[in-house]
């Protein structure tokens, strides 16, 4: 098995620590063969906090290029960004993609039909919210702008009762991923958050078992993502738990998106 990770942050998003080289050094130490750096993309129009500033982007990409040059004989390093989906920004995604090796969809906000309000996925409270989130994610996937779907089961993070809406949502997302042949991520950071915030819970905030049992019914590739916000925890017990979680369900896990 080759160790890889394509979901990695750094200090520029203002809620992670470490620079690009810090993560690269850990990846090499842990025997990784590939590492994707994918910090939160600048979106000055929305959600200015918790993501890099527009003026930081060129330096961010340059830092990755410097790491590629310095460590390229030891590990393959890729340039990426994790970004929200807003249909009015399709040209922005194309602009970013020209500078990147791949683009990650991380859907933390969603919209309802006929409503341009940006709703927070962490505040999903109703079955209608769940379905709206899933339909919006499917729209994003089918836009063809994204190469990797981070934490697709995020909609259950605070909606704890798996019900018919959750099941339908999982089918909607899985169908879109299968149609576009885009991998869905089993996210290790959801396991970290579970242990830190809800140690008494009998399941993870995400990955959510019932969601992934539905994914398994489709011809969908899956990938394990660390979603590392701390280079000291990029390869930790939660990453191994995520790998075992995928093995137990029998998911079609890929090691690389290339």
Where on the chain are the PLM-derived regions?
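Hydrophobic residues within beta-strands of alpha/beta enzymes
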Residues: 35-37, 103, 149, 184, ...
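Hydrophobic alpha-helical segments and helix pairs
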Residues: 80-123
């Amino acid at each position: 098995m080759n160790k890889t990770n394509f979901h990695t942050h750094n200090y520029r998003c203002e809620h992670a620590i470490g620079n690009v080289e810090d993560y690269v050094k850990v990846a090499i130490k842990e025997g990784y063969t590939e590492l994707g750096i994918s910090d939160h993309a600048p979106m000055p129009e929305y959600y200015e906090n918790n993501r890099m500033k527009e003026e930081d982007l060129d330096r961010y990409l340059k830092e990755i290029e410097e790491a590629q040059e310095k460590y390229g004989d030891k590990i393959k390093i890729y340039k990426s960004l994790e970004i929200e989906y807003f249909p009015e920004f399709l040209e922005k995604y194309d602009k970013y993609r020209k500078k990147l090796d791949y683009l990650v969809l991380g859907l933390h906000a969603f919209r309802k039909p006929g409503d341009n309000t940006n709703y927070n996925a962490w505040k999903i409270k109703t079955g209608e919210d769940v379905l709206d989130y899933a339909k919006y994610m499917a729209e994003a996937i089918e836009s063809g702008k994204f190469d990797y779907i981070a934490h697709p089961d995020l909609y259950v993070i605070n909606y704890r009762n798996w019900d018919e809406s959750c099941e339908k949502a999982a089918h909607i997302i899985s169908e879109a991923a299968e149609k576009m042949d885009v991998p869905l991520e089993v996210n290790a950071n959801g396991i970290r958050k579970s242990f830190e915030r809800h140690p008494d819970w009998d399941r993870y905030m995400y990955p959510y078992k019932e969601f992934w049992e539905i994914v398994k019914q489709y011809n969908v590739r899956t990938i394990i993502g660390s979603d590392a916000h701390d280079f000291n925890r990029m390869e930790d017990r939660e990453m191994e738990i995520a790998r075992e979680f995928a093995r137990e369900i029998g998911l079609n896990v890929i090691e690389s998106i290339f």
